[in-house]
């Protein structure tokens, strides 16, 4: 279960860049809760710029680069290890999802419950959030996921197990790489059953 707003709304937003096995990632947080995560862009500077950009409707938000401590430092260490193949479900990392629309939060809750090495289809996620037939809406919600990897949208596939669209930098190649790191089998090729 992901916590919503945890009293961090009035705290400043901090961010940092860190190197991983797949390149430089970035994380933004308020207090002890993660609010955004960024997979590697074309350069470390582009990754940091993306995580630091102001969100729509938050013109007063200033993101400052800081050295992480406490649970945020622990989260970075776990992400680093996960991307190096020491798998962690990352569910213990506290998130602030209070500003995310309710349907998206429901989709993210279901998605976050998928263990590394496993996948669901967009339709299965729709069924689990109580919206049968809403696979396209699930895909749209996952395309707007502000905290990829920690909310593992890469673990949601088309019904035929094919890798369709992935809005993170690197697109389908990044999705395929993350699934390979997690030793996920049966993706990328349609099955007969």
Language-model-derived ranges and their functions:
Residues 1-132, 181-193:
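Basic nucleic-acid-binding alpha-helical/helix-turn surface characteristic of O6-alkylguanine DNA
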Residues 133-177:
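Short glycine/serine-rich loop segments
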């Amino acid at each position: 279960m992901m916590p919503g707003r945890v009293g961090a709304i009035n705290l400043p937003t901090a961010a940092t860049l860190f190197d991983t096995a797949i390149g430089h990632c970035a994380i933004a947080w308020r207090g002890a809760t993660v609010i955004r995560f960024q997979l590697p862009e074309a350069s470390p500077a582009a990754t940091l710029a993306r995580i630091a950009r102001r969100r729509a409707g938050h013109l007063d938000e200033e993101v400052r680069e800081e050295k992480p401590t406490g649970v945020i430092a622990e989260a970075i260490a776990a992400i680093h290890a996960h991307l190096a193949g020491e798998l962690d479900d990352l569910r213990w990392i506290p998130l602030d999802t209070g500003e995310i629309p309710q349907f998206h939060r429901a989709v993210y809750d279901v998605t976050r419950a998928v263990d590394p090495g496993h996948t669901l289809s967009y339709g299965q996620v729709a069924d689990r959030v109580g919206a049968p037939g809403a696979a396209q809406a699930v895909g749209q919600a996952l395309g707007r996921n502000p905290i990829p990897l920690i909310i593992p949208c890469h673990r949601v596939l088309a019904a035929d197990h094919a890798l369709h669209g992935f809005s993170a930098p690197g697109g389908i190649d990044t999705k395929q790489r993350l699934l390979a790191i997690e030793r996920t089998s049966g993706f990328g090729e349609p099955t007969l059953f």
